[in-house]
Structures are given as structure tokens and as C-alpha cells.
């Protein structure tokens, strides 16, 4: 290799083409290339020069030659130095010089090497066909995957995982969980191939109804990750430990902190045993049973309670006398000396005074601008932030890294705000912040980082998203709070780093132009970005304009958030504490502060919750598909949920078990409903819910067994159902318990709807509306945390968890309870995995109150509709109805409408008693209509869930309704959140009548 480089140096002057050839043809890495760590010891020079490490380094060196950063002579020396280093790794070490380590169990893992390989299914020559239900797809054969296993050496731990990406032709896509092909000792996991197939079926089970079953579902990608670790002993867990024991939240740990004595010896002696280096640990201690724990997140810094420790399956108990409970990690061992017993108490929600938080935490507001590269990854090129009244920015490939370093240099506790940061900005900064923190924790929902805490040596960084409180775009929020106007920026003109330095003679605005073309029974729709140039001359680069735009965004966000908090404090006497991170949390605090003193809202046990949760029925959607070219009237309920909370009674107190129904009280019951009619009666209103195969439906039925609240059962009686009770929970008291809460917010909203305040539109109304919409009721029915998500080191945590023995139900121990073995998925396939722990936590809110509010809301709308005999509702969604005008007494209908709490309101936009002249209904959340507004202008309203409004037209809905075989295919771009990065994805969404 060096001879070739020397020859090249002597023969050519302009060598760029030859260097490119040499880079691609000589320093070549393919699927057969081996790592230096998988080569046999004392391999030949040629074998070492064929390794991944040598050739990857060669490619880097030749890139530097091409850029004229180094000479060929320097390159030769560097390659020779690399070879000598790799040869030293490949040599057999003198075992006589190796210090003997007492036991492998108390060593720590150090990452020696890690790599990954992305394979297209076409790379596998002997792929086999996997068939499941109506699906058939090619997957790698078992032998081909086994052939990828590296050569195994002793003294190393191997984490070798495979995961498959499954995709459909339109919107569907899924990734299987990581499956270990070998265990950490290098032995093949005999059942790995069956587990791969099992995980494929779980992905295929999620194929939604809008994917045609005969559609081609394929295995698109096979990702292999390999991490090689080595055990190396270290001394201790904590710095400057002086005490013998440490008290955690629910257990006490003997630390074995005497640095002059072997920690294992200290533990043996503490357990009443005798130290003897010739014996195993089991023989040295009197306890017959040993349970060994390791930190769940593979770091002792994260351990605060038993919930942060994992162990093999074991019968949960707190016996620390007859069982030796050892905590082993990072070259050290301790003894758990006491485990506190769980004390179950009946939780109660009651009136609480809102605490005013005085914690000193600085605030930083930031925004990121990025472009989408050829691989569809979002590439940040600019970050702006505000701190202590000053604006800063960084640009370039390292802008995020530089921002994180700057923030950490402040050495103070900081709340980091980004508008919609939970779904975008935090996913860019997280890898840099996580790599530097001591420990961290997050609340993750739907791949959104709704909250985060990252601990550093001199600071804590909190991640909070203002959007999760105000629930609208920054543009709309800026207008509602009368702050600086947010600008617009043509993001789509940037495709590469080079574009940033361009100067457009005239600045540009982007308009989206819809393109349609028909293919058989399918109408295909996509859009193009059209550039509209301004008249004024532009002298700034694209980057300079982006900086100004980004600064305005940061200022707007800061001003909105500060004003929102000040208005909350002034008008509702509440502060947003550091650890309050959503609107529903905030509203629940306000609601609890307004409860009557005598009210105690009972929180159900997990066993009770498992029953009453079946009475939670979500948003009611009724859709009578068709083309309606006649007069249609619309109405919605003024603040439906708040009206149900104020105008109807709700229960409180501890329930009792019953097998009957007392309609003078409130309860939640398992009943059989039997309709008196044999077929759907005329004028039946679809308000009685039921679930069939977990799918919610509102259609008429003859007989059904299910769980229902009293308000739902009152509706059922009115609709001709006989009710037979099997069991239930009856609550002792009921009252108008939410009146103070609703009155405070609703009167505040109404007072500032047409007020004479200096600022108009009045932002106080916006604050009241936000708090009212949050309602608190959403928290009542929030299910207990059934899934914990962690961002962990790639492969390593998965490998250690896979070692743990499970019971026949596939359960291991986390702390004091049994849970299913954690699931692991690749995140960036470089540094991090997503770990999911499925569990059942106790409820923390009064679930029956949420059920009561949901049921009462249906009852409110039902009673409003029953005012009109023969009413024909063609579409209804939660709080709104579309009605054939001829089916109601129009004058009576108008007289019943108004703007008071709980009334029907027939206003569309600003037009009262609007008449819809044409309406197309294609299914739930899929409709379009036209109406004349109060200025005699024809207005079109379009709605199709999951499709951007700018892609919709009335003619599309007309085409859809002409035939049940007609399909519309919308093609657009979406953002996929990966927690540690963001990608864009071209999506095709097929729409048919449902």
C-alpha cells in the first residue's frame, strides 16, 4: 500500500482523479470487511490492512490529500503509524503480566469498539419469504444473519443486535424491536430468529385500516449494530464517601466505603461471613439466597429508589436478613440492608392552596433553523437565543454544539424554552446535552420530549415547551398577546450549505400550488412551491435574512411567555412552577384550588381503575356519508365541557360496591343494555356508546354488556333500553362541585370579550380561554403511566437486560415489582437506543370525575338535541351538529341558540344563523361545505384529518362521493421525530369513504 502511494507521489503532479480512484478502489470497505477486534490474534500484515479500521482511516487520509491538507509523504507516515497501532491491538498479550481480578461480577464495562451496518434486503442473496395473514415479505434468512456474527474473543462482551424496518406504499411504517443474535459471551441465541418473526407480526398488526390489505408491505432495511465492551475494574461509585451507608427513597445501602479494604470482603463480613479468597462469594456468606441488582440505566448516579434497580425474576419481598441483596456496578459492590415496605393509602384530591414558587431559575429562549438534506435529515444551520435580555446566535455545522457549550458555561440552573421544542428543537440539542450531563430524565409521549431534566456538575437544565400551554402557533399567539409580529421565511429555498451564502437580487415568498392528476379511480394530489419575488432590492445573504427572522421568533416567544405568566399571576394568583409543563397540569392546579372544602375526590385503586376505565368513551363522531345539496344548519355548544362541569352535578366521596342502580345517586356500573325494539327506531339519536373489538361505535344495537356512568344510563333509558346491573361503584354524594372553578374562568373570559382594556384584543380573555380549555378534566381521565421511555446507551443497556432471567410470563424484577422485559429500539443507530418499560402504576387522579364530565357532556348535547322533534343530524363531532334544516322548526331552533354557557350557537365564523347550501360528508373528520356569510360572500370550509388544508378543494370531496371505489392520494412531506434527531419523510395518504 505504501509503495503504491510512493509511486503515485513520484509519477504525477495533478493527482486528484487518481486519488479519488485510489480512495474508492483500494481503501474499500464491504460487508465482508472485518474489524480489528474480530480478527484472530497475531493475524498477518495483509489481514490487518484489510480491516475496517485501517481502510476507514485510509479514506480519511486520502480526503486530506485531495484537499491538500497533508502531503503524500505525511500520509505514508500516518498510515504506517495506524498499522503499528492496529498490530499492537492484534497481538496476544502476556497473560503473566495481567493483574488477576477477583470476580467479573464487580467490574465495569468500557466500550472498546462499536459499529453499525445498514443493509437493503437486496443485499441478502438467500432471503426467505415470511408470510403472516394476508402479508408476504422477504426477510434475511437465519443463516445469513448468523454469517454476520464477528469472531469472538474472550475477555470481551459482545452486544450484537438486528432490527428490521417494515414499510407500506402509503403512510404505514414500523421498526421491529432490537433482537440479540448472540448473547454477551458470543454464543448464538437459539431463539433469535423466532423472536424476529414475532416482532414482525407485531408491526404488521399495526397496519391501519387505510392501508389496503392487499397492499405491498416490504422489509425495507436491516440494521445491524455491534458494540464490543471490556471489563475494567474501578474503585468506587461516589466521590468523597465518608459514611458507611446511604439512605435512598425506599431502601438503605451499605456502601463498603473503606478504601483500604476490598469491597467484596467488606460485604462478606457485613453479611456475617468469613473472607477467604479461595472460596466463591456464595460459600463465604451464611445466606442461602443471593439476589443481585444492577442500575436500570447502567449508571449509579441515576439510582434514587428500588425502581431504578433491575434483577433476575424473583418473588417480590423485602427480606434483607435471609436474602443477600447485592448491588454491583462499576467495579464496586454494596449490600441492600433494608427495603421499606410499600404503605398503600387511599389517595384523595381535595382543595389545595396554590404554592407560589420562589426558586431562582434563569430562562433561555431559543429557536433553530434547518434545511433538509438529500437523505431527508434535518440539518441545523442556525440557532438564536435570548438570555438576560440579550440576543445571541451561532451558525454553521457546529452551531448546536457551540450553543450547548455556551449555555453550560453560565453555571446556573436554566429553563430552556423552545416553541414546539418538544417535537422539534429539543430533538436537535438533546444528543449534545445528554453527552455532557451526569444524569437526566425525561417525560416522552408520542416521541415528543414534553419535559426534561439534565443534571450537570454546576447546574440543572430543564426543558419546557410554551406550546404545551398555549396550544397554538407562535404566529397566532403573538397576535393574541399583542407582541412583536412574527415574520415569514422561505425555508424551502435552502437545500445545502452553499445556498446560505447566496444573495437573491429580490427577496422571495413561497406560495403552494396544488397539482392534480387522475389515474383510473384515483385522484393524485401534490403541491409545488412557487417562488414569488418582491419588488424591493435585496442585498443580504440568505443566512443574514434567516438570522433576522430567527431573532424575531425568539423575541416573540419570550414576550408571549412572559406576558402569559404575568397575566396568570395577576388575574388568577398562580405561578407556573418549574416542574409544571402542560396546560392540563396548570388547569388541574387551578381547579383543585377552587374545590369546596368539604369535597374529597376519591382516587381509585389500580384494581378499581381497571374496571371503571371501561366507562371512558372518547369524542363522539357521527357521520352519515353523502352529498347534501339542500339547506343544512350548524350549531355547537358554547363551552361544552365547562358547561357540563357547572350545570350538572358530579359525585365525590369513597364508593361502595353494589349490584343495583340508584338513579338518585351517581355511579359507574357494568350493565347489560337490551333495547325494547328489534330494529333501529325512527328518530333514534346515536348517543349510547359501546366498544366492539376495542373500536368505539355509536350505532344502534339490540343488546350489549359494558361499563357506563349514570348520565349515559339516563340517555340509554330515554332511547328505549332496559338496564340490567351486574356490579358497580356507587358514590355517596353529588353536588355542583366545579362551579367556583368555572365561574372564575368563564366570567373572566366574558368580562374581557368586549372590555375597555387598553390592549385589544384583550390578552386576559386569551389567558382565561386557555385555562378554561385546559379544564383539568383531561387529567382526571389520564391513564396511569403504563409506559416509561428512556434514552440509553446503544446496545449496552439492552445487552445487560437480556442477561436477566425471566419467569414464564417473560417478567423480570424492577425494584420491588415484576414487569415485562424492557423493549429496545434503535434511535440514531450511533449512540442511543430507546428503552420502553411497560408497567401498571396506581392512578393519581380521580378517574370517576373525568368519566362523569365526559358522560355529562354527552348528556348536555343529547338534551339540547331532544328539544327538536324529528331532528335529523347528518354529522356530529363531540360538541357540534350539522342538521337538515327541514327536520327542525327553524324559528324554534334559532330561538334556542345564543352565546350563554351551555347554549347551542349557530354562528359560523362571524355569521349568525348561517345556512349551508351544499355539504359533502366522506366519513369521520372528513367533510366540506359552502355557505353564504353575512356579507353575501360564498365561503368554503374543508376538513380532512391528517391532510393540510392548502391541499383540499370542494371538487375533491365531490369526486370522492361519486363512487365508493374512488380514492384520493395526497402526497406531502411530514416530520418524523426520532428523539435525538429529526427527519422529513414523503408521505402518501390514501383517502376513501369510510
Swiss-Prot record:
Enzyme class: transferase
Family annotation (Gene3D superfamilies): Palm domain of DNA polymerase
EC number: 2.7.7.7
A Gene Ontology molecular function term of the record: DNA binding
Reactions listed under catalytic activity: DNA(n) + a 2'-deoxyribonucleoside 5'-triphosphate = DNA(n+1) + diphosphate
Keywords: DNA replication, DNA-binding, DNA-directed DNA polymerase, Nucleotidyltransferase, Plasmid, Transferase
Biological process annotations from GO: DNA replication
InterPro entries, alphabetized: DNA-dir_DNA_pol_B (IPR006172), DNA-dir_DNA_pol_B_CS (IPR017964), DNA-dir_DNA_pol_B_mt/vir (IPR004868), DNA/RNA_pol_sf (IPR043502), DNA_pol_palm_dom_sf (IPR023211), RNaseH-like_sf (IPR012337)
PANTHER family membership: DNA POLYMERASE, DNA-DIRECTED DNA POLYMERASE
Record-stated family: Belongs to the DNA polymerase type-B family.
Note: This DNA polymerase requires a protein as a primer. The presence of the two linear plasmids, termed pGKl-1 and pGKl-2, in strains of Kluyveromyces lactis confers the killer phenotype, i.e. production of toxin and resistance to it, to the host cell.
Protein's name in the database: DNA polymerase
Organism: Kluyveromyces lactis (strain ATCC 8585 / CBS 2359 / DSM 70799 / NBRC 1267 / NRRL Y-1140 / WM37)
Amino acid at each position: 500500500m505504501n509503495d503504491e502511494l510512493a509511486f503515485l507521489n513520484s509519477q504525477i503532479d495533478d493527482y486528484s482523479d487518481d486519488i479519488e480512484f485510489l480512495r474508492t478502489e483500494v481503501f474499500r470497505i464491504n460487508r465482508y470487511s472485518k474489524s480489528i477486534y474480530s480478527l484472530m490474534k497475531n493475524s498477518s500484515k495483509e489481514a490487518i490492512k484489510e480491516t475496517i479500521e485501517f481502510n476507514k482511516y485510509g479514506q480519511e487520509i486520502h480526503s486530506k490529500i485531495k484537499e491538500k491538507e497533508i502531503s503524500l509523504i505525511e500520509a505514508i507516515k500516518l498510515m504506517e503509524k495506524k498499522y503499528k497501532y492496529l498490530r499492537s491491538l492484534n497481538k496476544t498479550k502476556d497473560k503473566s503480566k495481567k493483574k488477576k481480578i477477583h470476580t467479573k461480577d464487580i467490574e465495569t464495562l468500557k466500550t472498546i469498539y462499536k459499529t453499525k451496518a445498514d443493509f437493503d434486503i437486496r443485499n441478502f442473496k438467500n432471503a426467505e419469504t415470511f408470510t403472516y395473514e394476508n402479508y408476504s415479505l422477504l426477510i434475511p434468512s437465519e443463516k445469513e444473519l448468523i454469517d454476520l456474527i464477528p469472531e469472538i474473543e474472550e475477555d470481551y462482551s459482545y452486544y450484537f443486535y438486528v432490527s428490521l424496518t417494515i414499510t407500506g406504499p402509503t403512510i404505514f411504517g414500523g421498526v421491529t424491536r432490537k433482537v440479540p443474535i448472540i448473547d454477551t459471551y458470543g454464543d448464538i441465541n437459539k431463539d433469535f430468529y423466532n423472536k424476529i418473526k414475532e416482532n414482525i407480526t407485531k408491526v404488521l398488526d399495526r397496519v391501519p385500516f387505510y392501508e389496503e390489505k392487499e397492499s405491498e408491505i416490504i422489509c425495507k432495511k436491516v440494521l445491524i449494530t455491534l458494540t464490543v465492551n471490556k471489563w475494567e475494574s474501578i474503585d468506587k461509585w461516589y466521590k468523597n464517601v465518608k459514611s458507611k451507608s446511604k439512605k435512598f427513597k425506599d431502601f438503605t445501602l451499605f456502601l463498603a466505603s473503606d478504601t483500604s479494604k476490598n469491597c467484596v470482603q467488606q460485604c462478606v463480613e457485613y453479611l456475617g461471613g468469613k473472607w477467604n479468597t479461595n472460596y466463591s462469594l456464595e460459600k463465604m456468606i451464611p445466606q442461602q439466597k443471593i439476589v443481585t441488582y444492577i442500575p436500570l440505566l447502567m449508571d449509579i448516579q441515576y439510582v434514587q429508589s428500588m425502581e431504578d434497580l433491575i434483577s433476575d425474576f424473583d418473588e417480590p419481598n423485602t427480606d434483607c436478613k435471609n436474602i443477600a441483596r447485592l448491588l454491583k456496578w462499576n467495579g464496586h459492590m454494596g449490600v441492600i440492608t433494608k427495603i421499606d415496605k410499600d404503605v398503600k393509602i387511599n389517595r384523595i384530591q381535595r382543595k389545595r392552596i396554590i404554592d407560589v414558587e420562589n426558586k431562582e431559575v434563569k430562562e433561555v429562549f431559543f429557536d433553530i433553523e434547518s434545511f433538509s438534506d438529500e437523505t431527508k435529515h434535518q440539518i441545523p444551520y442556525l440557532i438564536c437565543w435570548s438570555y438576560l435580555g440579550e440576543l445571541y446566535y451561532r451558525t454553521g455545522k457546529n452551531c448546536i454544539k457551540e450553543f450547548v457549550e455556551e449555555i453550560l458555561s453560565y453555571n446556573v440552573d436554566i429553563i430552556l424554552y423552545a416553541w414546539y421544542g418538544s417535537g422539534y428543537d429539543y430533538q436537535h440539542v438533546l444528543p449534545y446535552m445528554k453527552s455532557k450531563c451526569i444524569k437526566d430524565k425525561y417525560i416522552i409521549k408520542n416521541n415528543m420530549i414534553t419535559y426534561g431534566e439534565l443534571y450537570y456538575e454546576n447546574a440543572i437544565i430543564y426543558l419546557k415547551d410554551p406550546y404545551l400551554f398555549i396550544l397554538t402557533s407562535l404566529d397566532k399567539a403573538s397576535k393574541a398577546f399583542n407582541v412583536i409580529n412574527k415574520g415569514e421565511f422561505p425555508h424551502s429555498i435552502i437545500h445545502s450549505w452553499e445556498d446560505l451564502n447566496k444573495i437573491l437580487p429580490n427577496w422571495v415568498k413561497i406560495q403552494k400550488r396544488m397539482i392534480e392528476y387522475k389515474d383510473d379511480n384515483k385522484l393524485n394530489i401534490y403541491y409545488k412551491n412557487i417562488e414569488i419575488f418582491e419588488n424591493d432590492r435585496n442585498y443580504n445573504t440568505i443566512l443574514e435574512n434567516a438570522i433576522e427572522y430567527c431573532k424575531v421568533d425568539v423575541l416573540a416567544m419570550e414576550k408571549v411567555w412572559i406576558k402569559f405568566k404575568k397575566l396568570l399571576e395577576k388575574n388568577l394568583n398562580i405561578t407556573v412552577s418549574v416542574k409544571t409543563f402542560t396546560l392540563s397540569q396548570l388547569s388541574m392546579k387551578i381547579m383543585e384550588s377552587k374545590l369546596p372544602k368539604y369535597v374529597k375526590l376519591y382516587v381509585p385503586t389500580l384494581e378499581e381503575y381497571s374496571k371503571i376505565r371501561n366507562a371512558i368513551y372518547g369524542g363522539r363522531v357521527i357521520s352519515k356519508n353523502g352529498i347534501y345539496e339542500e339547506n343544512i344548519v350548524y350549531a355547537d355548544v358554547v363551552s361544552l365541557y365547562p358547561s357540563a362541569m357547572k350545570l350538572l352535578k358530579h359525585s365525590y366521596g369513597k364508593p361502595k360496591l353494589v349490584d343495583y342502580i340508584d338513579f338518585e345517586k351517581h355511579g359507574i356500573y357494568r350493565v347489560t343494555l337490551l333495547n325494547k325494539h328489534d330494529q333501529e327506531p325512527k328518530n333514534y339519536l346515536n348517543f349510547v356508546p359501546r366498544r366492539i373489538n376495542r373500536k368505539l361505535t355509536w350505532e344502534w344495537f339490540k343488546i350489549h354488556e359494558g361499563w357506563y356512568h349514570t348520565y349515559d344510563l339516563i340517555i340509554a333509558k330515554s332511547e328505549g333500553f332496559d338496564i340490567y346491573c351486574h356490579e358497580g361503584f356507587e358514590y355517596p354524594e353529588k353536588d355542583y362541585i366545579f362551579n367556583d372553578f368555572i365561574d372564575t374562568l368563564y366570567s373572566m373570559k366574558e368580562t374581557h370579550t368586549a372590555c375597555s382594556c387598553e390592549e385589544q384584543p384583550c390578552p386576559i380573555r386569551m389567558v382565561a380561554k386557555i385555562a378554561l380549555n385546559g379544564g383539568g378534566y383531561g387529567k382526571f381521565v389520564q391513564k396511569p403511566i403504563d409506559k416509561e421511555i428512556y434514552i440509553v446507551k446503544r446496545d449496552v443497556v439492552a445487552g445487560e437486560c437480556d442477561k436477566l432471567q425471566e419467569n414464564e410470563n417473560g417478567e423480570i424484577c424492577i425494584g420491588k415489582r415484576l414487569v415485562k422485559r424492557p423493549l429496545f429500539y434503535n434511535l440514531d443507530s450511533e449512540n442511543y437506543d430507546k428503552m420502553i418499560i411497560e408497567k401498571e402504576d396506581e392512578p393519581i387522579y380521580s378517574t370517576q370525575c373525568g368519566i362523569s364530565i365526559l358522560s355529562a357532556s354527552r348528556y348536555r348535547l343529547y338534551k339540547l338535541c331532544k328539544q327538536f322533534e324529528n331532528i335529523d343530524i347528518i354529522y356530529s363531532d363531540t360538541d357540534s351538529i350539522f342538521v337538515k334544516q327541514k327536520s327542525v322548526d327553524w324559528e324554534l331552533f334559532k330561538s334556542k341558540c345564543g352565546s350563554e354557557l351551555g347554549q347551542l350557537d349557530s354562528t359560523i365564523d362571524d355569521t349568525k344563523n348561517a345556512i349551508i347550501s351544499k355539504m359533502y360528508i366522506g366519513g369521520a373528520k372528513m367533510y366540506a361545505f359552502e355557505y353564504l356569510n353575512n356579507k353575501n360572500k360564498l365561503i368554503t370550509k374543508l376538513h380532512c384529518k391528517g391532510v393540510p388544508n392548502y391541499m383540499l378543494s370542494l371538487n375533491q370531496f365531490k369526486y370522492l362521493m361519486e363512487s365508493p371505489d374512488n380514492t384520493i392520494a395526497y402526497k406531502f412531506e411530514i416530520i418524523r421525530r426520532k428523539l435525538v434527531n429529526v427527519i422529513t419523510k414523503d408521505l402518501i395518504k390514501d383517502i376513501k369513504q369510510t
